[in-house]
UniProtKB/Swiss-Prot annotation:
This protein's name: Na(+)/H(+) antiporter NhaA
InterPro entries according to UniProt: Na/H_antiporter_dom_sf, NhaA
GO cellular component terms given for this protein: plasma membrane
Lineage: Bacteria, Pseudomonadati, Pseudomonadota, Gammaproteobacteria, Pasteurellales
GO MF terms, alphabetically ordered: sodium:proton antiporter activity
Membrane topology qualifier: Multi-pass membrane protein
Length: 394
């Protein structure tokens, strides 16, 4: 189990470095002579037609709705694996990170809402600071991998996975457009076929690719966000086949490097480019970016740590062996690294088809500022709290 986690951490750490490079390249492109070409390239229309059926969207939307759906297949498989036989497979294992994740979602959302309570045009962005970027957070942990306890890494993984579940629920409930009943019926049929394939332990991945593609296209047309199709597909991949095959593990092993080294960096490059033209200190400290930044920097650590501490004091959960509350707080600060998921939710919050570019730019700047500070402070705290054995608190 520990060996699998170590391999996963190494992969995610390398992916985190690529994410950072992609984000920096995006900022350079958006604020240089290449700026017109960068934004024009992302708005290039790409159409796919099959008889009467067609999807015609800008390249940016293909990346956000299409490639990110593949990433969410991986998320779905990771969540399923952890629920069935991993760090969330029992009440005792799941309850401590569950309290952490709930606090890390509720408090940032409340801080954002409080700061933007008098600005109705910004209020739909309340979910932006709720997210944690697992690749970046694990990348920071990997820099100190030799001195960070394995239990602490497992805690962060479990917390991030529950955080992903929360993000999936939020996307499903709050970011759906006008619904198409025909598309929903087709999607429902595709889901039933996937569930049947799972029940009969069909292990041929090509079958899931075909039905999954139909599900993705119908969900896209239905008004529900298309990435949710990815989660459903991931959940329907069997953990084991009739003859002992491991289709979920095999597909996870195949998709993980593609997501870490291609899809997420491409998403970062496409979404992190923010033009700083016309930006001022007054704009950067306006309610929208301020709410996001403080939600990530204050809301995340306060929410994660306080919910963990209170749960332990109330006897509802136990502090995992080998870690202490100082280390939990360091991890809580790292949870303020919201980058990819926060940027993704910002795009959903402020419109995909006809977004307000000024609002999107301000929200992305708030995310980048909050993420950067959380990464630096989290690294310092984690290094300080894990540089020598500490007596467990609690």
């Amino acid at each position: 189990m520990i060996e699998k986690i170590q391999k996963f951490l190494k992969l995610e750490a390398a992916g985190g470095i690529l994410l950072l490079i992609a984000a920096l390249l995006a900022m350079l492109c958006a604020n240089s002579v290449f700026s017109p070409y960068y934004f024009e390239f992302l708005q290039t229309q790409v159409a796919v037609k099959l008889g009467a059926f067609s999807i015609d969207k800008p390249l940016l939307m293909w990346i956000n709705d299409g490639f990110m759906a593949v990433f969410f297949i991986l998320v779905g498989m990771e969540v399923k694996r952890e629920l069935l036989e991993g760090s969330l497979s029992s009440y005792q294992k799941a309850i401590f990170p569950a309290f952490a994740a709930i606090g890390g979602m509720v408090v940032p959302a409340l801080i954002y809402w409080f700061i933007n309570r008098d600005y109705p045009e910004y209020q739909q962005g309340w979910a932006i600071p709720m997210a944690t970027d697992i690749a970046f957070a694990l990348g920071i942990v990997a820099l100190l991998s030799k001195q960070v306890p394995a239990t602490l890494k497992v805690f962060l993984l479990a917390l991030a996975i529950i955080d992903d579940i929360g993000a999936i629920i939020v996307i499903a409930l709050f970011f759906s457009n006008e619904l198409s009943m025909l598309a929903l019926i087709i999607a429902s049929i595709a889901i039933m076929i996937l569930i049947t394939m799972n029940r009969y332990k069909v292990t041929g991945i090509i079958h899931y690719v075909i039905v999954g593609t139909i599900l993705w296209a119908s969900v896209l047309k239905s008004g529900v966000h298309a990435t949710l199709a990815g989660v459903i597909i991931g959940f329907c991949i069997p953990l084991r086949g009739k003859k002992g095959e491991t289709p979920l593990h095999d597909l996870e092993h195949t998709l993980a490097p593609w997501c870490a080294f291609a899809i997420l960096p491409l998403f970062a490059f496409s979404n992190a480019g923010v033009s700083l033209a016309g930006m001022s200190l007054a704009k950067l400290t306006s309610p929208l970016p301020l709410g996001i930044t403080l939600g990530l920097l204050i809301g995340k650590p306060v929410g994660v740590f306080s919910f963990c501490y209170l749960a332990v004091r109330a006897g509802l959960a136990k502090l995992p062996e080998g870690i202490n509350f100082k280390q939990v707080f360091a991890i809580a600060v790292l949870c303020g690294i919201g980058f990819t998921m926060s940027v993704f939710i910002a795009g959903l919050s402020f419109g995909e088809e006809h977004p307000d570019e000024t609002i999107l730019a301000l929200s992305r700047l708030g995310i980048l500022i909050g993420t950067s500070i959380a990464a630096i402070v989290g690294y310092i705290l984690l290094k300080k709290t894990t540089n020598k054995p500490l007596v467990q608190a609690g």
